[in-house]
Amino acid sequence: MLTIGCHLSISDGYEAMGKTALSIGVNTFAFFTRNPRGGSVRQLDLDDVAALRSLMAEHSFGPLVAHAPYTYNPCSAKERAREFALEAMGEDLRRMEALPGNYYNFHPGAHVGQGVERGIELIADTLCQVMFEGQRTCVLLETMAGKGTEVGSRFEELAAIIDAVCARRPELDECLGVCLDTCHVSDAGYDIVHDLDGVLDEFDRVVGASRLRAVHINDSKNPCGAHKDRHEVIGAGCLGSAELGGGEDVFARIVSHPHLRDLPFILETPNELAGYAREIELLRGLQTD
């Protein structure tokens, strides 16, 4: 069965997220580690976390995909912003140890005029500091749309970050991966509508297929190469709409592709719970053997 879910609110706690997930028939989900705009985080309730872990085991959940707030910019030109990212990411990863075996996804950041190479250097340096030997959480760099000075819209940039971390901290190799966002990769110029195989072959050649650990499955309001990053409901955008994109076959190929089909899929579309349930039913019906 397709491992699929959506973003859920952590406001009522961990077990509540699990129960909400079950109510809409999903077997994974994503959540922000703290307010998506950043800030403080409430004390971890270990009993609540244990209740979620029990629920996940009982109902055969796949890995969860925790998401770092958007405010983190580990390659900012401002030292204070980099320090904030360093402190908060470190705290997030320590807290994630209460939920072992799951994923921590983050946006690599924007170099804001320093240049891509400097951005890569700063991101790798942050990861080398916040990650630790023996950690039980895999850190995922998200593929980006290339808006402004974002780092990570090209596969080569993601590979360079991972290579830089592993060169300094080889013991972290197994704890680094990539989350492929279907809206972002299309907006970045990778034509997954007409050449999904070619795009994934390129990823395999540049980064390595084994680094793919999760998928943010979203339609896009904009055509390939727009560098906009505006998500759309599945089937209503430039990927899955018959009028604007390639129709449902595009998402059928995505959820059925041998490099992707067994990964956790997370919806980040502009929807509510009932809408997510409909999208999930659609995508499960599109997966073929």
Which residues does each PLM region occupy?
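Acidic/histidine-rich catalytic cores of soluble enzymes
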Residues: 128-234
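Active-site beta-loop-alpha junctions enriched in small/polar residues
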Residues: 7-11, 34-36, 69-71, 109-111, ...
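Acidic (Asp/Glu)-rich catalytic clusters
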Residues: 19-25, 45-65, 90-100, 128-135, ...
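C-terminal helical cap(s) of enzyme catalytic domains, especially alpha/beta-barrels
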Residues: 273-289
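Active-site acidic/histidine proton-transfer and metal-coordination neighborhood
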Residues: 58, 74-177
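Conserved, mostly hydrophobic/aromatic
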Residues: 21, 67, 96, 104, ...
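N-terminal pre-domain/capping segments
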Residues: 1-68, 72, 76-93, 289
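A short, acidic, amphipathic alpha-helical segment used as a generic capping/interface helix at domain edges
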Residues: 197-206, 237-259
